[in-house]
Amino acid sequence: MTSQYAAELCALLVEDNFGELFARIFSTLQRYDRLSLPRLKFYSRLSDRQLRHGLSAMIQHHLVYHYTSYDDGVTYYEPNLQAAYYLVRSGKILEFIEERLGKYAATLMETIMFLGHAQVGYLETLPELQPAPPKANGVKQEAEGGESEEQMNGDDVHTSDQPALLHPTLKALASHGYIFRVRDAQFQSYADNALDAERAIKSRPDVKQLKGKKLDETVLEGTVTLLKERLDGDLTRGLMHNGLPRGAKRRHGTGSADATNKKARMDYVDADEDEDEEENEWSDDEMGGDTTPMELAIVVRVNYEKLDVALRNRRFLDLAEMNSSPVTAQVYEGLLRRIEYQTKQCRDSAEIPREGEEGEQYSVPIALSAVTEEVDPQLDLAGSIGPMEISQAINKRGKRPLEDSVNGTDREGSEAPSRTYEVDQHLSLLSQPPYNLTSKRVLSGLITWTVEFRHLARKLRHLELERMIEARYGDVALRVIRVLHAKGKLDEKRLQEISLLPFKDLRQVLASMQSGGFVDLQEVPRDAQRQPSRTIYLWYYDPDRIRSSILEDTYKAMSRCMQRLRFERNRLKEFLEKTERSDVKGNEERYLSQAELTLLEQWKAKEALLLGEVARLDEMVAVMRDY
């Protein structure tokens, strides 16, 4: 993210979220990349007080790295562009957390985002993280545990239990990997940490005795290991049980299916859980009765890399929903969720390798039985995949004979293997071309299923590029692009033969796409004279170059949307300040005239339009860069 428009977008996001002081410091660091405090003061034209307060707050939000040199003892500061960009994804993340873990978890995550990082003991003192007191008018219906009478009388019986709600929620977020512990090395850039780790490895007595290639290999291996130790803030240890995070609710129904799986659920879900809470993803009871509070001295922050994994899985699920039945998509969701629990980040490398140079990267294998446990027992799996046994004998009347299991006489004995088989069939459907959403593996005689991340990430990028090309140039251009992508470099004659297009239409499409930068032309001379008549012209499609170009255009479009939003805010500054007053907010009908109400409605519609466009463009950035 070192391009011009990416830096411009990050500065606008910082200004929009934190104000002009943060934006000036961030822009100055962007322009000069790495500065000491005196030089930063000189270039930013800020006072010592402003600069120190601004830097301390920006360091808390991880917007600025700082590093003290071993040579001269001077502290240097540099911007963290990735943390600044993640500001645009905060709303999407909070929406996902609320959908997965509930409203209170989203409120807690929002608070941690607002603070940058926070100590658990400090979070206990915040009033916004305390649940609302029960109403005294008896509007709320029956409470669990026979507490309805005390609530109707207005007694605050939950006051002593309110702090206990924070810690199970923190444990749920930590066990899912959505928050992690803050380490000292996280305040420094990766390059500075790598240099420190390399210096520490080289200073070891056993390493000093090595020479040549052995020394280089030992230093490289030791540096990587030491970096992982210093940067590791994982809090999931001790909070995972049987591969599941504490607080994760397994899908379950009622009746015989629920009774069959009751014993398995007891490992991590309370069997007496109220069915009215099934709409919530987790509850305190599902923590297995663990009410031990987290250590108050732990400092936590948001784990954006893990959240990228969860958001990427949602895109994979959307791809499955487009090309399969809803039942198959739900089975795929269970597999992806199990994989998410054991996947820390989308990619090991920061940059996406070029097409053809990127190796396969399979997810952790998930046992078929584990996927079956994740699927709702009430889900009709057989209804969308047809008959299970195709080779059954047909009688004289043209009908297959009914088995005992169909009549229900042998249902209990065949239900478990039958359901496992059905889940396997749905996953097999997903493994078919063209998307190959799953892959089957047999490990030690155990059937497991995995997902090939890099293949699906490439597929998402190609689909995004094809959608854009079709929208700009039509379906004929899309056909040409697919031919070039599949066959490589082709001359015009061979391209016409494969695409089955008239020369006139083909040349028009190629010319328009070349002017737009989607296809390129390579000249291959047949002799040293390089005459046009003795030259072969090859058309080709380079998805890597186009991806970089589209990504830059997307940054530019997002930047223009943020600039337009800032302009509109400044134009209506006095009016918006009036609407944000504490006496006016929530009472607009009372304090605003009809013309002002109309203006406020127009402003909200315009703001929603611009922010919605930024969110849509962020989806494209995630596909092109992060997944």
From Swiss-Prot:
Pfam families: HTH_9, POLR3C_WHD, RNA_pol_Rpc82. Residues 554-575 are annotated as: Leucine-zipper. Keywords: DNA-directed RNA polymerase, Nucleus, Transcription, Zinc. DNA-dependent RNA polymerase catalyzes the transcription of DNA into RNA using the four ribonucleoside triphosphates as substrates. Specific core component of RNA polymerase III which synthesizes small RNAs, such as 5S rRNA and tRNAs. Its main location: nucleus. This is DNA-directed RNA polymerase III subunit rpc3. The lineage of its organism: Eukaryota, Fungi, Dikarya, Ascomycota, Pezizomycotina. InterPro entries: POLR3C_WHD, RNA_pol_III_RPC82-rel_HTH, RNA_pol_III_Rpc82_C, RPC3, WH-like_DNA-bd_sf, WH_DNA-bd_sf. Residues 144-153, 269-288 have a biased composition (Acidic residues).
